Curated annotation (Swiss-Prot):
Keyword Metal-binding: yes
Region of interest called Disordered, as start-end residue ranges on this chain: 1392-1426
Native source organism of the sequence: Alkalilimnicola ehrlichii (strain ATCC BAA-1101 / DSM 17681 / MLHE-1)
The name this protein goes by in its record: DNA-directed RNA polymerase subunit beta'
Top-level taxonomy: Bacteria, Pseudomonadati, Pseudomonadota, Gammaproteobacteria, Chromatiales
Keywords carried by this UniProt record: DNA-directed RNA polymerase, Magnesium, Metal-binding, Nucleotidyltransferase, Transcription, Transferase, Zinc
Enzyme class: transferase
Length: 1426
């Protein structure tokens, strides 16, 4: 282990290769060994001569000469005296740069505690001595004595004594005991610790105790003591006798004009320490009174504290201008600290920035670079060329020529620039496509020209955005820029694998316009021999683009074997489409362009082109598309006029109808038929429906034109400009058009509740004052949110990158057979994501069989590409097990098989790809689009009308899942289960639709029935929740006390009365007396407090005996929650499936459970929800035990008769019934599931599925596509740590959090030695926690809480193996990813076997090299096939 600071002792000794960095505590000897002399005086420099003072903070004798090779007094100058020490001034003659690396030291007159180990919680000193922080501070700051050696006295070691107590003890015991105060006392205590003995006793204590909290406390201390023992640090080093002094050039003193000086704050802080130290020395020599010395020692301690970490204890020391001084700790932490400012965020030479303008004539790989800018950026290349040509003799002459900008200079510039890519970057760089390489084209002017198609990737527009240009200098850098970063090599988005180079806005509009059919177009019905003729006809004005014509086209398509087949045939199509097909490359069929080219269709076209024709063809095609789109949209002349916003004529009638309905509801409310909450819900519902209806009418009117064709009226798709913009996907959406020409609809208040009076006007008609005022709420909130959102999104990305930065593909295959189970995602009647989309680009984990047979369709280990997926779809496969990063067994990193396809390249992922960072960027980049709370479009409330039935969309057969039904006397079935679902299967037995069936829904079909499309299979009342009886009998009320547990409400209009259950909280304090039969059959009076009464309905037979639920011996008792409304009378007869009571549902905040970004952050931080769902801890049968005061007791009886109890608060909705069977991990009380519970009860894959689903839901709502595997990669990083359950014979402690890789390595070693390995369970850490808990302390320290991380790492003597990317960037090495991965592998191999490495370098290892190249080919084979 080399000592970093002593490396600089030998002149010119640079740090050679190193593979790890260790951090530890510095012993006083080590600090003295770094030092070149003691700093004795607080002076800095002499203000008259500007020479450093001798023995001061800038002393040249200690730190080295101020000028190169010149001593301070000027006796020795120049290089020939190098290494001489001047006898007059004592300065060594050497370069001045040593003042950046030579350290000094200060010998402290009294020891001082290091504040980090004292105050950084948990206090390390306190933990070692087993004392509280408060006590130790009292000792250190001279408020109390501590007993160090009790001798024969009754005092105890480590006991604190106040002044009086100390004097008393002295009186009593004289000098039999020893007590001290200050850091010396703590130093003595630490020195006298017997670490090994302590560790032994602690281990025994832990074995012998059962209390959790005690174990936690003891193991904390044990861990620290063992860390000290292992690392070779000594506890007494946490108290310092000698203080290192930073080299002077790192804390400079700079003269300003006017004779003043700017100084680094550190100089002030050091000066304070030196002053106090010198004063203390003098006082000790004079043997001053104790109290004065004590005070001075305390001040010394405080000044050292301030130097190390100002403001950590007490008030921060401030400078002249009331601003706290920047201490050593502040230098490294925070955004402005060393890590984030200088090590991770360096500024780059050879770069410039300018405004961007559009470059529609560029090709995809080009950018326009202003001449002046290029001249400046490529200067070194121009100089060398000028010298090479002999046009300039020296660099100076070359410089002159360039400044004069002579003709030859421009010629040489254009030569230098040829084929030399430059990199363009637009801040904020949210994902890797924010920096791309282009070939520069010299242009006049001062703005950079950017190709329009890369705007999406950069998220750039031309409203004044600026971009930076960087020049890759070395040949390797140019090569990488060209091969990896060129815009033409980044066609697909790394987030979703879809093309990102797709036309948008005017290009889309142009292509859409040219491919739209016009029924009344000029030249319809003409016939052409080829596309050239169509061109001529169009240019001569005989033919409109939208005319349907017949034309002969040449179509070239690939056959099965990959050969190209040409066929020429006649098609009937729109003229514009024939013209468009001309630029489509060979290999794509005509049907791809024979449709209206909306943005989606164009994206599909580019995608198909990339998959079938390859990269080069796609690049050329994309450019052609753009040129054509621009020219066509110019020709189309689409513009917006007020008349384009057509308000539908039916609007008035629709509104009038809605007003009527609302009036009805208001009347019902007035007559007491509905509660206020129900009224509000229904009104909001009506207006939501109305808004939909108006929008529908408007779109119908806008989307259709009537034209006269050959004397008759025909209907066609509209050519309304606004409609075309929205329909083509160029700009705008149906929701925006709705506000322009429909009605604005319901608005939301800032708190998210919906204002029940909607804005019936639209922007075309104009808003009145009230309407405008209502709509300002949402609009303002929207703007405020946007500002907060951007910052939050950036922070989320930072946390994600930090947790996943060290995840790299490190091997080809880890050999696991595990994986995730994939099925299509179906919500309601829609297949939201097909199986094909989910498994595309994944590797199959186990053989896939054709449903119902044992024929293997895809073998394990197949990488599924587009063709494979299509094949699987045709075979009717509806579930596949695929490999996933979550289940990957690779220790460090992931393997290529588990990751699957590299989404941005379309083939298997290469070893060395930094998949972690890609995942983090893919999730973080769309973060800015995610709203904080989802109010779209100027605050218009987006709340779907509540659903009250299930209407099937496809015909097929119905399957019911966990639906328990009872047959109603009307012949229908009523659902009496809570988590039931109904699915519709097609003829192949594949699931097409899936719906939730709520409790109390009336089903009109049974399991296995055939249904037609459009049929309603279930319906229910969305605003109330019924309680259904499962048996027939008489109603008997129990615990119904009018005025106490129930209140009778009489409707004034109808005169009908109903009972409403009151809330137990509002019942008052009385007691209720009731008669009960005791064990001997006697009637006894029982007193029950009002609060404990539980109103319920019992069902009894004719004789009044309790009835049981069919098939069980559980009595039919139905408990009634607060607010339940009962409209039956006591003794009424009920039939199976009747409703006994109904509970009104009041819900109408904007349907938006923490939407958007905060939801994503909550999931990744693995936060516990406020009211988590309660999950069943074991499988078994549910029963209810005796209730406690505020909780109900739920008992689960396992199959073997063991019982498990769970106390559930009474206000929680329990979703299971007595006698129901639950599986481990099933929900028993509603709520948001807690991810930690899912992991504990259901395992890693269930957790992954949950997180992926929840996060995808948020992104899907915003229409953002992200591949599942990115979320899985982050999940893998959150599951890095495991909790040790039983340490076995390992050195881990019970409950310790350890990296999974470390436990597995330790277990391998234990198993090899035939010892019992440790058992562990996976732990889920949030991304911030996981980043701070990483094995690499450098990475953690540069993320957050720098002080805490470094303190902890130093006491452990932590070693950083520089595995991740971040650590390597910080120490300035190549990162172990991409091209750096191979470099590091090579180095590792060379170290492991230096002789073989040397041989292979010379070329002696003849047998070896062909082998490696062969395996290389073998490794890349599958990707070529795919």
């Amino acid at each position: 282990m080399k000592d970093l600071l002593n490396l600089f002792k030998q002149p010119g000794a640079q740090l050679e290769d190193f593979d790890a960095i260790r951090i530890g505590l510095a012993s006083p000897e080590m600090i003295r060994s770094w030092s070149y002399g003691e700093v004795k005086k607080p002076e800095t420099i002499n203000y008259r001569t500007f020479k450093p003072e001798r023995d001061g903070l800038f002393c040249a004798k200690i730190f080295g000469p101020v000028k190169d090779y010149e001593c301070l007094c000027g006796k020795y100058k120049r290089l020939k005296h190098r290494g001489v020490v001047c006898e007059k001034c004592g300065v060594e003659v050497t370069i001045a740069k040593v003042r950046r690396e030579r350290m000094g030291h200060i010998d402290l007159a009294s020891p001082v505690a290091h504040i980090w180990f004292l105050k950084s919680l948990p206090s390390r000193i306190g933990l070692l001595l087993d004392m509280t922080l408060r006590d130790i501070e009292r000792i250190l700051y001279f408020e109390a004595f501590v007993v160090i050696e009790p001798g024969m006295t009754p005092l105890e070691r480590g006991q604190l004594l106040s002044d009086e107590a100390y004097l008393d003890a002295i009186e009593q015991h004289g000098d039999e005991f020893e007590a001290k105060m200050g850091a010396e006392a703590v130093l003595d205590l630490l020195k006298s610790l017997d670490m090994t003995g302590e560790a032994r006793t602690l281990r025994e204590e832990i074995e012998g105790t059962n209390s959790e909290s005690k174990i936690k406390r003891l193991s904390k201390r044990l861990k620290l003591i063992e860390a000290f023992l292992e690392s070779g640090n000594k506890p007494e080093w946490m108290i310092m006798d000698v203080l290192p002094v930073l080299p002077p050039d790192l804390r400079p003193l700079v003269p300003l004009d006017g004779g003043r000086f700017a100084t680094s704050d550190l100089n002030d802080l050091y000066r304070r320490v030196i002053n106090r130290n010198n004063r203390l020395k003098r006082l000790l020599e004079l043997s001053a009174p104790d109290i004065i010395v004590r005070n001075e020692k305390r001040m010394l301690q405080e000044s050292v504290d301030a130097l190390l970490d100002n403001g950590r204890r007490g008030r921060a020391i401030t400078g002249t201008n009331k601003r706290p001084l920047k201490s050593l700790a502040d230098m490294i932490k925070g955004k402005q600290g060393r890590f984030r400012q200088n090590l991770l965020g360096k500024r780059v030479d050879y770069s410039g920035r300018s405004v961007i303008v559009v470059g529609p004539t560029l090709r995809l790989h080009q950018c326009g670079l202003p001449k002046r800018m290029a001249l400046e950026l490529f200067k070194p290349f121009i100089f060398s060329k000028l010298q090479l040509r002999g046009l300039a003799t020296t660099i100076k002459a070359a410089k002159k020529m360039v400044e004069r900008e002579t003709g030859e200079v421009w010629d040489i510039l254009s030569e230098v620039i040829r084929e030399h890519p430059v990199m363009l970057n637009r801040a904020p760089t949210l994902h890797r496509l924010g920096i791309q390489a282009f070939e520069p084209v010299l242009i006049e002017g001062k703005a950079i020209q950017l190709h329009p198609l890369v705007c999406t990737a950069f998220n750039a527009d031309f409203d004044g955005d600026q971009m930076a240009v960087h020049v890759p200098l070395s040949l390797e850098a140019q090569l990488e820029a060209r091969a990896l970063m060129m815009s033409t090599n980044n066609i697909l988005s790394p987030a979703s694998g879809e093309p990102i180079i797709v036309p948008s806005q005017d290009v889309v509009l142009g292509l859409y316009y040219m491919t739209r059919e016009r029924l009344d177009a000029k030249g319809r019905g003409m016939v052409f021999t080829d596309v050239q003729e169509v061109h001529r006809a169009h240019q001569n004005g005989v033919l409109d683009l939208g005319a349907r014509v017949q034309v002969r086209i040449r179509e070239a398509v690939f056959d099965e074997n990959g050969g190209m087949n040409e066929r020429v045939h006649r098609v009937e199509t729109v003229a514009g489409r024939a013209l468009l097909y001309e630029i489509v490359p060979d290999g794509l069929p005509f049907e791809l362009v024979d449709r209206d080219m909306t943005k989606k269709a164009i994206s599909g076209l580019v995608n198909a082109c990339y998959r079938r024709v390859g990269l080069k063809g796609t690049v050329v095609f994309a450019d052609q598309l753009m040129y054509m789109g621009f020219s066509m949209s110019t020709g189309a002349g689409v513009s917006i006029g007020v008349n384009d916003m057509e308000v539908p004529a039916e609007k008035e009638k629709i509104l009038a109808d809605a007003e009527e309905e609302v009036k009805d509801i208001e009347e019902q409310y007035a007559s007491g038929l509905v509660t206020n909450g129900e009224r509000y819900n229904k009104v909001v519902d009506i207006w939501s429906h109305t808004n939909e209806a108006v929008a529908k009418a408007m779109m119908e009117k806008m989307g259709k034109d009537l034209v006269e064709v050959d004397g008759e009226q025909k209907e066609q798709k509209s050519f309304n400009s606004i409609f075309m913009m929205a329909d083509s996907g160029a700009r705008g959406s149906a929701a925006q058009i709705r506000q322009l020409a429909g009605m604005r609809g319901l608005m939301a208040k800032p708190d998210g509740s919906i204002i029940e009076t909607p804005i019936t006007a639209n922007f075309r008609e104009g808003l009145n004052v009230l309407q405008y005022f209502i709509s300002t709420h949402g609009a303002r909130k929207g703007l405020a949110d946007t500002a907060l959102k951007t910052a939050n999104s950036g922070y989320l990305t930072r946390r994600l990158v930090d947790v996943s930065q060290d995840l790299v593909v490190t091997e080809e295959d880890c050999g696991t057979t595990e994986g995730l189970h994939m099925t299509p995602i179906i919500e309601g009647g829609d297949v939201v994501e097909t199986l094909a989309d989910r498994v595309l680009g994944r590797v199959v984990a186990e053989d896939v069989y054709k449903p119902g047979t044992d024929e293997v369709v895809a073998a394990a280990g197949t990488l599924l590409d587009e063709e494979w997926v299509e094949h699987l779809e045709q075979q009717g496969v509806d579930e596949i097990r695929v490999r996933s990063p979550i289940t990957c067994q690779t220790r460090h990193g992931v393997c290529a098989q588990c990751y699957g396809r590299d989404l941005a390249r379309g083939h298997g992922v290469n070893v060395g790809e930094a998949v972690g960072v890609i995942a983090a960027q893919s999730i973080g980049e769309p973060g800015t689009q995610l709203t904080m709370r989802t109010f779209h479009i100027g605050g218009a409330a987006s709340r779907a009308a509540s659903i009250n039935n299930v209407q099937v969309r496809n015909s097929g057969s119905v399957r019911l899942h966990n639906v328990k039904v009872v047959k109603h006397h009307s012949g229908n079935y009523v659902a009496v289960s809570r988590s039931g679902e109904v699915t519709v299967m097609d003829d192949h037995g594949r699931e097409r639709e899936r719906y939730k069936i709520p409790y109390g829904a009336v089903l009109s079909v049974a399991d296995g029935d055939a249904v037609e499309s459009g049929q309603i299979v279930a319906n229910w009342d969305p605003h109330t929740h019924p309680i259904i009886t499962e048996v027939e009998g008489r109603v008997r009320f129990y615990d119904f006390v009018e005025g106490v547990t129930v209140a009778r409400e009489v409707d004034e209009v109808t005169g009908l009365s109903s009972l409403v259950v009151t809330d137990p909280k509002s019942r008052g304090n009385g007691e209720h007396r009731r008669m009960v039969t005791d064990a001997s059959g006697k009637q006894v009076e029982e007193r029950v407090a009002y609060k404990d009464l539980r109103p319920m309905i019992k069902l009894v037979d004719e004789d009044g005996n309790d009835l049981n639920i069919a098939g069980t011996d559980i009595p039919a008792h139905y408990f009634l929650p607060a607010e339940a409304i009962i409209s039956l009378e006591d003794g009424a007869e009920v039939r199976v499936g009747d409703a006994l009571a109904r509970i009104p549902q009041e819900s109408s905040k904007t349907r938006d459970i923490t939407g958007g970004l905060p939801r994503v952050a909550d999931l990744f931080e693995a936060r516990k929800p406020k009211e988590p769902a309660i999950l069943a801890e074991v499988s078994g049968t549910v029963g209810f035990g005796k209730d406690t005061k505020g909780k109900q007791r739920l008992v689960i009886t396992k199959a073997d008769g063991e019982t498990y109890e769970e106390l559930i608060p009474k206000w929680r909705t329990v979703t299971v019934f007595e006698g129901e069977h639950v599986e481990k991990g099933e929900v028993i009380a509603d709520g948001e599931p807690n991810p930690h519970d899912i992991l504990r009860l259901l395992g890693v894959t269930a957790l992954a599925a949950y997180v992926v689903k929840e996060i995808q839901d948020v992104y899907r709502l915003q229409g953002v596509k992200i591949n599942d595997k990115h979320i899985e990669v982050i999940c893998r990083q959150m599951l890095r740590k495991v909790g040790v359950k039983d340490p076995g014979e390992s050195h881990f402690l019970r409950g310790e959090q350890v990296d999974r890789a470390r436990v597995l390595e330790a277990n391998d070693a234990l198993e090899a030695a035939d010892k019992t390995p440790a058992t562990f369970e996976p732990l889920l850490l949030g991304i911030t926690k996981a980043s701070l808990a990483t094995e690499s302390f450098i990475s953690a320290a540069s993320f957050q809480e720098t002080t805490r991380v470094l303190t902890e790492a130093a006491t452990r003597g932590a070693r950083d193996d520089l595995r991740g990317l971040k650590e390597n960037v910080i120490v300035g090495r190549l990162i172990p990813a991409g091209t750096g991965f191979a470099y590091h592998e090579e180095r590792r191999r060379a170290q492991a076997d230096p002789i073989a490495a040397a041989e292979s370098a010379i070329g002696l290892g003849g047998g070896e090299q062909p082998a490696t190249s062969e395996t290389g080919a073998g490794g890349s084979d599958p990707s070529e096939e795919g």
